[in-house]
UniProtKB/Swiss-Prot annotation:
SMART domains: ZnF_C2HC (SM00343). This is Gag polyprotein. It comes from the Viruses. The record marks N439, F440 as: Cleavage. It comes from Simian immunodeficiency virus agm.vervet (isolate AGM155).
Amino acid sequence: MGAATSALNRRQLDEFEHIRLRPNGKKKYQIKHLIWAGKKMDRFGLHEKLLETEEGCKKIIEVLSPLEPTGSEGMKSLYNLVCVLLCVHQEKKVKDTEEALAIVRQCCHLVDKEKTAVTPPGGQQKNNTGGTATPGGSQNFPAQQQGNAWVHVPLSPRTLNAWVKAVEEKKFGAEIVPMFQALSEGCTPYDINQMLNVLGDHQGALQIVKEIINEEAAQWDVTHPPPAGPLPAGQLRDPGGSDIAGTTSTVQEQLEWIYTANPRVDVGAIYRRWIILGLQKCVKMYNPVSVLDIRQGPKEPFKDYVDRFYKAIRAEQASGEVKQWMTESLLIQNANPDCKVILKGLGMHPTLEEMLTACQGVGGPSYKAKVMAEMMQNLQSQNMVQQGGGRGRPRPPPKCYNCGKFGHMQRQCPEPRKIKCLKCGKPGHLAKDCRGQVNFLGYGRWMGTKPRNFPAATLGAEPSAPPPPNNSTPYDPAKKLLQQYAEKGKQMRNQNRNPPANNPDWNEGYSLNSLFGEDQ
């Protein structure tokens, strides 16, 4: 990638990529940090083109510098990046982010501004009696003191723009309440009403907020009734529910109640609490899914499930103890079976980091492939595949022919190969040399050419049938027929050898004696 997609030219980009993120660190700035900063600028109502010039970077620093001490990590990272860009535009050599921050504080006089924000211009610190200082210690927002009077400072368009974009993107999600708390810090009821009036859409949600405001205002009037009789001249009246809501009070009266009244009534903070209650009702309406319904899918990564779970916990209108109990009991209970087995093996009360580390990769395609490979390996090693459709009794585990142990075959046997006879099963000789099972002719089984007879070992076996009575031989029809054929054959041989003299059919020509005469 080149410098065409960044806020710097090629020479400035080379210098930018030599600056380290931390002192003595290995990581350095890259072009992806500039792209990330351009996307982050929209959240603060700033245009990304401001990063391309020195004046634009100074304007960004003026906006972000008041928020930097109490800002989030993303906001601090953006502020540090803009300070580095300002040094690059000013062609000042810096090695890391810390040096850039020190140079920016000096050139932009941020140290002097921080001191003047706490100390009045006269150089002498006044006492808090008489209402000369704001409750937060700063006199820049939402009002400034000029002489003995307080002057209202309206909200900046950037703040209103950030609020509108947050509502449009989140649609009254769980993030809206902390976003409103951050943007309305120290505001007067007039400023808060201005934040609500700039919302063109979501009028249904705003109507819910107005109903909550009316209920809280009525409750305030009941608990804080106005004093009977006329007020003394010059004394400020006590605020009512409509005064706190900003409908029957002016901006100057609101400032006097907050800063100069005796006793003081922070109408801005009270009205802010009412708005937060209404926004919490809107969040519950726009997020009807309860934390009890959040369950991990069979193929959902555990990290995504945790994000959805804590988002639902954030939207729940419950105390901290109840949310803690929900987290401890439901997070593991509603996980899928694969993650649940792993989480239960971690013991009692595992941390979220331990759970995320243990379930990393569970449910993904790689994890499924790994489990399938292990299952196939176990099936192959045990040889439990049923042939013939699974009919009959299951086969026993395989037995090794080499060592005689169960659980593996001969090709998987770890012991050295032994010479063993296939007939008798004894080691030391082959089947062709086996003398264990031979017949009475001296031949064993499977020796091909000679007739197969019963083994010699079975000739002397006792018969299982009882002996015939009187030691007589049992009748055998086959044996009887064989004897008849033998006798008949003997008679025919005798007749051919000695022909009868009185037989007229006998012809000597049929005999071989006629061929040789008396020589035979």
